[in-house]
Amino acid sequence: MRYTVALTGGIGSGKSTVSDAFADLGITVIDADIIARQMVEPGQPTLNAIAEHFGSELIAADGTLRRRALRERIFSHPEEKAWLNALLHPLIQQETQRQFQQATSPYVLWVVPLLVENRLYQKANRVLVVDVTPETQLIRTMQRDDVTREHVEHILAAQATREARLAVADDVIDNNGAPDAIASDVARLHASYLKLASQFVSQEKP
């Protein structure tokens, strides 16, 4: 198994900004959210299964999934969320493993929004948390997704707390400021992870 840095953070924390910065340095990024989105693209069997289960009204005229409508449907129906997870999670895990096997960079950045909630941090060598204040999360998510404050507050209430994420963190990037401040933090961590990955490889060798 390649040395793995798990990246997590709450909604609106800026995980994509951070993961893009690592990708720019040549690091393989495996993003659970991106894999999940690919699973429900038009033509995928999973999208057909979702349409059959929830109804064709969740499919837009262009054949794509109406994600917001699906989110709203499962948010207030735990049993529907459980059904969707049972459908998607095995496929996401399978694709994640495939991408790990194909990775070529010295270490892999594994982006997992629900790392703490699903206790997946146990599968990583190191945990990097993108940290912002709850108020920053609210403002960014409202602007990005064009949703109400109440909607975002419901999402935040369902996610792990800021304290719970920080409790499992080995490294933290403070993303409350300007996005261009991220690059220097990522460069510093990248240098550290290269050393750790090298040590990991030498320990793995017989």
From Swiss-Prot:
GO molecular function annotations of the record: ATP binding; dephospho-CoA kinase activity
InterPro entries: Depp_CoAkinase, P-loop_NTPase
GO biological process: coenzyme A biosynthetic process
SUPFAM superfamilies found in the cross-reference section: P-loop containing nucleoside triphosphate hydrolases
Binding site for ATP: 12-17
Domain of life per record: Bacteria
Pathway it works in: Cofactor biosynthesis; coenzyme A biosynthesis; CoA from (R)-pantothenate: step 5/5
Catalytic activity of the protein: 3'-dephospho-CoA + ATP = ADP + CoA + H(+)
Domain DPCK residue range list: 4-200
Its job: Catalyzes the phosphorylation of the 3'-hydroxyl group of dephosphocoenzyme A to form coenzyme A.
Similarity field: Belongs to the CoaE family.
Protein name as it appears in the record: Dephospho-CoA kinase
